């Protein structure tokens, strides 16, 4: 719950800032995520885990504003409620199915490929069809990540020192599901 409180603070801060801040904040967020997930042995990782929801909240404010302008308040709110329901359902699935830890590497490779293509497409114009496909792949990927992360918890693969990182994983699963469902619908 503390991540959501920090996200709320980030949303408030985002409402006070110019939308021009999104790109630098997004870059900082990506760098911090890379540090958290690939350099886990640093003493200050927990500090970064607390900073990330604030940064995500700032960018989420402007992302949500963009989709509210495109789709309207009611649809964005409906997608948010729908994302909550889907997330809970995926979590339940992850808790009841047998161990699926072997898919973790495939999910990571898919995520890295998706990130690379997303970065490339920032510099090269692409059509709505490609963006629709990318958003669809991202929705599927983060759905699978949600099932996978809950499954990791269920089968005892989360060590005590990694609890805050797993909380961050689940938080990011939800945020990415929400944003990518919005992106998919807007295409």
Positions of predicted regions on the chain:
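A hydrophobic alpha-helical transmembrane-helix feature that marks the membrane cores
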Residues: 1-187
């Amino acid at each position: 719950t503390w991540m959501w409180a920090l996200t709320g603070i980030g949303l408030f801060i985002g409402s006070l800032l110019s939308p021009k801040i999104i790109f630098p904040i997004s870059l900082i967020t990506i760098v911090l995520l890379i540090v958290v997930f690939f350099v886990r042995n640093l003493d200050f990782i927990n500090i970064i885990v607390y900073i990330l929801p604030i940064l995500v909240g700032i960018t989420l404010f402007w992302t949500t504003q963009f989709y509210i302008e495109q789709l309207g308040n009611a649809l964005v709110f409906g997608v948010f409620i729908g994302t909550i329901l889907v997330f809970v359902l995926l979590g339940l699935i992850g808790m009841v199915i047998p161990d699926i830890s072997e898919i973790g590497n495939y999910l990571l490779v898919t995520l890295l490929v998706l990130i690379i293509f997303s970065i490339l497409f920032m510099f090269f114009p692409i059509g709505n069809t490609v963006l629709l496909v990318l958003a669809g792949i991202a929705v599927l990927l983060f759905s699978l990540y949600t099932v996978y992360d809950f499954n990791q918890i269920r089968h005892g693969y989360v060590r005590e020192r990694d609890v805050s990182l797993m909380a961050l994983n689940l938080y990011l699963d939800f945020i990415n599901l929400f944003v990518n469902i919005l992106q998919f619908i807007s295409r």
